[in-house]
Amino acid sequence: MDFPAAQPKPAADGKIIYYPPGVKETTDKITNDEVVKRLKMVVKTFMDMDQDSEDEKQQYLPLALHLASEFFLRNPNKDVRLLVACCLADIFRIYAPEAPYTSHDKLKDIFLFITRQLKGLEDTKSPQFNRYFYLLENLAWVKSYNICFELEDCNEIFIQLFRTLFSVINNSHNQKVQMHMLDLMSSIIMEGDGVTQELLDSILINLIPAHKNLNKQAFDLAKVLLKRTVQTIEPCIANFFNQVLVLGKSSVSDLSEHVFDLILELFAIDPHLLLSVMPQLEFKLKSNDGEERLAVVRLLAKLFGSKDSDLATQNRPLWQCFLGRFNDIHVPVRLESVKFASHCLMNHPDLAKDLTEYLKVRSHDPEEAIRHDVIVTIITAGKRDLSLVNDQLLGFVRERTLDKRWRVRKEAMMGLAQLYKKYCLHAEAGKDAAEKVSWIKDKLLHIYYQNSIDDKLLVEKIFAQYLVPHNLETEERMKCLYYLYASLDPNAVKALNEMWKCQNMLRSHVRELLDLHKQPTSEANSAAMFGKLMTIAKNLPDPGKAQDFVKKFNQVLGDDEKLRSQLELLISPTCSCKQADVCVREIARKLANPKQPTNPFLEMVKFLLERIAPVHIDSEAISALVKLMNKSIEGTADDEEEGVSPDTAIRAGLELLKVLSFTHPTSFHSAETYESLLQCLRMEDDKVAEAAIQIFRNTGHKIETDLPQIRSTLIPILHQKAKRGTPHQAKQAVHCIHAIFSNKEVQLAQIFEPLSRSLNADVPEQLITPLVSLGHISMLAPDQFASPMKSVVANFVVKDLLMNDRSTGEKNGKLWSPDEEVSPEVLAKVQAIKLLVRWLLGMKNNQSKSANSTLRLLSAMLVSEGDLTEQKRISKSDMSRLRLAAGSAIMKLAQEPCYHEIITPEQFQLCALVINDECYQVRQIFAQKLHKALVKLLLPLEYMAIFALCAKDPVKERRAHARQCLLKNISIRREYIKQNPMANEKLLSLLPEYVVPYMIHLLAHDPDFTKPQDVDQLRDVKECLWFMLEVLMTKNENNSHAFMKKMAENIKLTRDAQSPDEPKANEKLYTVCDVALCVINSKSALCNADSPKDPVLPTKFFTQPEKDFSNDRNYISEETRVLLLTGKPKPTGVLDTVNKPLSATGRRPYIRTTGSETGSNISVNSELSSSAGNRSREQSSDISETGVSENDENPVRIISVTPAKTEPVKNKEINSDQATQGNSTERGKKRTATASGTENIHQKAEENNADETGPSLAAKTRRGRPPKPEPQGTTAKNEETNKPPVRGRKRAAASQESPGSLEAGNAKAPKQQDTAKKPAAAQRQIDLQR
């Protein structure tokens, strides 16, 4: 390039400065504008020069040095500085690789100067931006800053440069600017000897969240820079984290407090940046500082959980160490670990297996928040994709639906409901996913069995929003309900039925409240209204607060007539679902307060409205259900598609309609609905027909007047069902006729007369339905049929049917058989007993001899163990059925006050002893019937005392069930007394504490209690007393402990009304009183206070105290008292009281059994336990008897001395259907040794063992309990006594008489002498070895 001759100017140091042609000398003497003008020409000159122009380079060297003078570097004018910087950049380019500046200080000043000029890059709209860009481009291209490596303090320049570039980068810069910046910085990092901490900080600071949010472009620039220089910068990063994490030198950097944020960002940029850091994190996970562990867990949770992370597979030791933090002692650490699991499950399904076990443990964490978050974690992942959560994880959520904390239960229930709606209702992931969560509907409805009102309300809400969404169109909603009901398990169906029943009950309470508003104000009206408000409040969450809100709502109702009319419409039987929705919104709008965003009063009212509003069922809905069922009958429905067979759909549909007929009867009243039901009546399925009759019975009150065509078709069908249908159909048909027809007398007579004439005991299979029909007819229309029935009862039922055994039962030793195996004759006899009861219940007359005769007959049935004729023709299982029927019959009659009066104490005791029957099913079913009647307050209080005898039950589950029954009954009675203030005389029949005298009297007459001073017998008495007293003494309400003590003391001042002049009877009574006093005194320190009132004793059981009679005697010795209280166990394996021979009437013997001993009847875990301690809640190791069937006739005892671990017994009720099903279970399969022919169900399996038993296992005397071994030489002597005892015969001279009539059944049997002797020690040794 040719330059014109330059104009030389003398420099300050004497050297001549050559300026480019046309450029005058640039000094501080000229203006800034002139300086700029001249510098622009200089810039142009240097810009055009290249490195090869040696002459020019030499010529302009002084100028280059001059431009680095203080005048230019410190010039206040930014344009001057920019132009100088551009010149200097070009000078470095031209003179590269050597700079013309030899002074290190000057070089440092120059580069700091250039760096400062780079700040001008910030404003892209500046007219000078292109020059700034040129400056950056030039520096980056030439790598000018690499010159600084020679400087000692080059780091200061680099730090300033990096900070400048990161501060100026912004979103208005194009890609070229960013690339030049990257080139500039990366060359410094990669070509230097290392990166100092300060320089590293200048990069890393841009990754901190606060800075990252302020300048996203700086973050991106740092990210790309780190990626580009990863190999060079990684050791520097590792050193930094090592200093901070391992050595704890937080002072090395201002970023020390942000290390975990930095690790997270660096890992996202490139995991290789942290190759050396990860092991340091494993070290930190084990820190003693909980907060430090928490910070590391938070960090690693993000690292492991991020979507593209493969850290868990790349670094297994760190992953395993991290999983260990799920079990950290520090609660926040465990909480953080659980929260992480959700992201991990969603982003890394392959790690679910590793997480499952840890989540299982945390689902039982003592901290509520952690259990809650486990649920949230699993449900969140499940809602994203069901395949992300395995069955085990869903199982954890299922468990938590029963958590002790409401927040956790609610989360679990709502989570499962959402999954069900998504995958079952909407089928978003196909049939397999729907099948995977199909159990949810059952589980959620099962929760309705919980006692908490919050649980019940949430189940109702879930049902209305998730299981059968109420906002669906009617047809869709009913289809959803129809197939849901068909696919529910039996317990879920019961829960759903109970839910509708509770809602209907609450509707009726609100209806009654509105009726009270219509009545004139009075004191009685106010009291009734208050009681009704308290009842309504109990059906709402937090009953305490609810009472105040309900009272307030009641005031509003009283003042606002329009609101009352809206509420009346809402609960009226004709209210449609759409109307209900409008009413609820209207009432809520009226009660809303705009000034009060959170209104607890309104929330409570909404709860009430949601419970009573008919959001699912109305006339249109019932019509839609019936159409669906018709389609199932015709075979045109989608039954198979919905996973239900047509038969199941039809049966379930009818059952559903039957339940709804109780709660919404008005909605059924249409010809179309009834036509469909008539079609069901003609179907072969007995259950379907039975349900259809029930629906007619519940809903058909207007059929006669409004639908004559339906009436004329229905009558002959009902007649046919009453005569020849199944027993259940017959019962429903008779009740249906009585309920819906005005000429019921004529209709019933047309059934009664032909049936009563055609009774034939020789064909028992044809007797059952007629006996059912006749019994219900005589109960429903006693005035018309009581007299004609009397002759049927006397001539046929008693004389011909009950007093004769026409067939011989199967002698297989079973104590129970399934329903289908029971002989028709016994089924007929059971129905005959029920007929007697129904006939008497209809008459309600205790003046006639019929009631007494029937009670004597039933007593005779119990005394004779079910074999009324005592001809030994009836089988053991049939005898069990008849004993159960007789005991249940007495209990049923006792529910009618007029018959309760004439039931003698002896008959009551016989009835009570059924709960100690040798047959498991008899005990089970009788206890359920007893509880059902007591809980409805139908039975007198004395019958609750029967549960005390359950302490003797050999099966733990039965004891547990009895205890639950007691808890329920006592709480119901106490609640009833609170809600219904009453006079003292009524308290006698309701106050639970008044059960004590009945219990004492019952135990004093226990046939097992023969020797008042026998310690083992007294221990049994004590166990029975404590079984009841423990529940009664849970709380000392109104000084009840002292009251019970006073009752026991007062009994000692009376005599036994049953046998007032018999010293032994009175001694036994007083002894039981002393045992009761002993127990009460030992268990309560509060019983020594004075009783607030003097208890009244029942005169039926105790005489009036005599004025001059005092009874200070102690009937149990101090030694005995100590033995009873210390609970010294009886000798292992020997239960003297249980094993003694039969000693009184009405007692069926049985043995203490283990879980395998209920004899193939039912699967129950139970152990033989000593009588010490509370048998309902044994916690100790029990001696386990194996190889005995409780229901075997002649069981053989094989005693194990290994302590058996007790299993917790769930307190559940088992209904009679389950009892029969239980016979098919696999309990007690093969026994080590057993008597031939004694196995209750698995007889064939046992026959192979019969030959192994040998002569020593000959048939024993007693069913159900092993006899005591006798000394040698007594075998012949006892051949007679080894025969089964004949029970119920009269004493001595009268022993040959046969009970041929009702009167004979009233005879008492003598107490037999205890002929069995105690086992010898040697014999016991043999038993144990066996």
Curated annotation (Swiss-Prot):
Keywords: Cell cycle, Cell division, Mitosis, Nucleus, Repeat
GO BP terms in the entry: cell division; DNA repair; mitotic sister chromatid cohesion; negative regulation of DNA replication
Biased composition (Low complexity): 1160-1171
Residue ranges of HEAT repeats: 387-423
SUPFAM superfamilies the UniProt entry points to: ARM repeat
Compositional bias per record (Polar residues), positions renumbered to this chain: 1216-1225
Region entry Disordered, spans: 1138-1330
GO CC annotation, single: nucleus
Main location group: nucleus
Compartmental location: Nucleus
Subunit structure: Interacts with the cohesin complex. Binds chromatin in a cohesin-dependent manner.
Functional summary from the UniProt entry: May regulate sister chromatid cohesion during mitosis and couple it to DNA replication.
Family designation: Belongs to the PDS5 family.
Name used for this protein in its record: Sister chromatid cohesion protein PDS5 homolog A
Source organism of the structure: Gallus gallus
Gene: PDS5A
